[in-house]
């Protein structure tokens, strides 16, 4: 039985809109605390999810996480593992996890469509046996699942998948192309040492406006 429970304000809204009985039934029907076979198959096929976290003051943020199919691992029915790949260096979500641990994950399939929500307590790990599951990972995140919520596909726009991201690290050696924003002239002096002096190898420096135009036009090198 999951420990998931409605807040007082949620209960008040249920009463206002006559959904108390429905919401109580849904706790039994769609909320669970361990991965079902369907959950496992859905997550194993995912190339992305959205990660919600909160800082010590309770301010939330949400970030997009992507990888190759199967990049979210499930060592058992109550645990998720996922990598932290090279990003923008701000570590908003990872800093929140290190501070408060509470997370929400939203897995979406826009083709079918379908979705799955996961709530849990998360912790950062440098364990080589875990981090080594993803060549190119800086470290990893372990999520102890507290609730899974199966949602209907209502309101999800149906889309067609075209291609995966070219920036996902190679699953055998961890190599990945240099993203376009690391070519912006204004940030060259503050890039990590490992990324400095690489712009000339991939087409040279860009201004912020040039990079912005690449993003707006869907340039895959952005």
How would you label these PLM feature ranges?
Residues 1-222:
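Binding-site signature for planar aromatic cofactors or substrates
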């Amino acid at each position: 039985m999951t420990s998931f429970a409605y807040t007082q304000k949620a209960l008040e809204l249920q009463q206002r809109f006559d959904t108390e009985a429905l919401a109580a039934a849904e706790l039994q029907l769609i909320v669970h605390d361990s991965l079902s076979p369907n959950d496992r198959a859905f997550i194993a096929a995912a190339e992305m999810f959205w990660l919600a976290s909160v800082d010590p003051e309770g301010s939330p943020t949400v970030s997009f996480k992507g990888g190759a199919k199967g990049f979210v691992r499930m060592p058992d029915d109550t645990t998720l593992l996922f990598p932290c790949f090279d990003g923008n260096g701000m570590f908003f979500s990872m800093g929140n996890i290190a501070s408060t641990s509470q997370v929400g994950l939203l897995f979406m399939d826009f083709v079918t469509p379908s979705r799955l929500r996961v709530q849990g307590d998360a912790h950062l790990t440098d364990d080589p046996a875990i981090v080594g599951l993803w060549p190119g990972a800086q470290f990893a995140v372990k999520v102890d699942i507290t609730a899974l919520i199966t949602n209907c596909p209502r309101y999800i726009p149906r889309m067609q998948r075209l291609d995966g991201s070219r920036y996902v690290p190679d699953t055998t050696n961890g190599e990945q192309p240099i993203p376009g924003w690391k070519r912006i002239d204004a940030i060259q002096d503050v890039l990590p040492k490992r990324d400095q002096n690489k712009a000339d190898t991939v087409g040279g420096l860009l201004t912020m406006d040039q990079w912005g135009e690449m993003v707006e036009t869907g340039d895959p090198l952005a």
